[in-house]
């Protein structure tokens, strides 16, 4: 069962990402220590698409590496 977009957004918020905004239901999440922003589109109760889950996982992994001081 796919996760909900609200769960992905909560994960990003907990990790220190901030919502830069967007048009409609699109949101761009960024963190000063992560090179790329994460774009999520949809309502909080919608099922997350596999590419959205992957983008969040990659961003959180990159943040973890940056906090440990490991280069990508």
Question: Residue ranges of each PLM-predicted region?
Answer:
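Aromatic-residue detector
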Residues: 5, 11-12, 35-41, 51
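Compositionally biased terminal segments of proteins
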Residues: 5, 30-36, 65-72
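Residue-level detection of beta-strand scaffold positions
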Residues: 13, 26-28, 60
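Polyanion-binding surface elements
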Residues: 1-19
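A short, structured beta-strand/loop element
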Residues: 17-46
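C-terminal structural segments of small proteins and small subunits
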Residues: 43-72
């Amino acid at each position: 069962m796919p996760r909900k977009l609200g769960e992905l957004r909560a994960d990003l918020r907990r990790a220190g990402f901030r919502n830069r905004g967007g048009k409609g239901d699109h949101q761009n999440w960024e963190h000063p220590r992560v090179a790329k922003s994460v774009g999520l589109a949809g309502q909080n109760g919608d099922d997350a698409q596999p590419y959205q889950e992957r983008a969040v996982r990659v961003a959180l992994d990159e943040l973890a590496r940056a906090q440990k001081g490991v280069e990508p």
